[in-house]
Amino acid sequence: SIKNITKNTIFVIEASSYQLEYSKLFKSKYAAILNISPDHLERHKTIGNYISAKFKLIENQNSNSIAFVNKNDKRIQNKIKMNKYKSKIIKVNTKINEKFINIFHNEYFLSSSNKENLSFVIEIAKKFNIKKDNLINVVKNFKGLNYRQQIVFKNKNISVINDSKSTSYSSSMEMLKKNNNIYWLLGGMPKRGDRFNLSKNYYHNIRGFIFGVNQKKFILDLKKKIKIKKFSNLKNALN
């Protein structure tokens, strides 16, 4: 609650490109940009505009600030090279050793996107002098966030995963590569510039159940790649 806020309270804010685009006053002591892929182009129009919006996080910082950026993301590194920023830039290597991942015994971090998230957690934890044992304990017991690769049911035969936060093909790739015999429910609003770039090696694992008013667009994108069925709404798809 507000009553418990002190000068040492740490606020963690997930700021979207929409919020950052026109931001002039928002300034953080620590900032992190994990990755950049073509997204929200229906608003930003170009990938360049989208990158500029995300980099407001760093542009608004001062010399006492620290920015964590993905060392392995070409778009991020190109932007860093082309500009000078006041804050200290820490480049995070997201290629975590598999043996290191096994320390945590948490299947949530087996996907490459969550390995990427974990690599940032580790680097930021170092800056806050968090003890290694405390970090390991927290990560071991982390259950994940709602709607983000969230396992809502599991037995020996089936896992039901809610990944509805993935609102584009690119953000869905990890789940499609990570699992076998996938029954993929998809609908909603297609995103401008979005491409289904999954390797052909995974096509045989996936069956698409497409629903909603925009199903024609999804069918056009997927019909030559994976087996699909179409439905008028989610209820019919589930039945």
Model feature map: region roles:
Residues 67-71, 185-186, 205-213:
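Short internal beta-strands
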Residues 73-78, 97-98, 191-194, 214-220:
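Short, charged/polar "capping" segments at the starts of alpha-helices
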